[in-house]
Amino acid sequence: MIELVRVKQEDEAILQNLIQFYIYEFTVFQDIKLEQSGFFAPFDLKPYWTEADLHAFFIMHEGELAGFAMVESGDPNVILEFFIMRKFYRRGFGKAAAEKLFGLFPGNWSVTQVEKNEPARNFWRKVIGDYTGGNYIEMFDDHNRSIQEFNSGLYAKK
């Protein structure tokens, strides 16, 4: 079973550790370099502790960290970052976590993937397509990023 646990400020270091894995995965799609320390530049998480519309969640499976999600709530709600540890791939955990997020923030959603990240595009098309019964809009921006838009309030899981 997948659980979303809101990240507390005192757990910021744990989230930053997971973000290192996330950024590493992104180096396949974008030119991201390590810093002299041997780490990737950390994310600025301060706004997550002060801004009411920014939300960070650990994705947990049976008490074990399986990933994280970062959301900006509003109109539309936006998946800012979403990561599942590779050992949890293809077990439905990402889909379950995404559906829980859609339910937590009912309304319009926008989900974007970078140009070369075909695995993410395929994942989100499948998840959103299944969730909405195929009733979503997909477009591409000037950077060839794919963007899916839909309203989760219309398809809330009972």
What are these model-derived regions, one by one?
Residues 2-17:
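A short beta-loop-alpha structural element at the N-terminal edge
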Residues 23-45:
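Conserved GNAT-fold acetyl-CoA-binding loop/helix
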Residues 44-57:
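A short helix-loop-beta-strand connector motif used in the catalytic cores of GNAT acetyltransferases and
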Residues 4, 131-139:
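Short secondary-structure junctions
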Residues 58, 64-72, 78, 83:
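Conserved beta-strand in the GNAT
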Residues 84, 90-103:
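Conserved acetyl-CoA-binding loop-helix of GNAT-fold acetyltransferases
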Residues 60-62, 150-153:
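Active-site beta-strand termini and strand-to-loop segments that position acidic
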Residues 110-125, 129, 139-143, 147-151:
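Conserved beta-strand-loop-alpha-helix junction that forms the acyl-donor binding cleft
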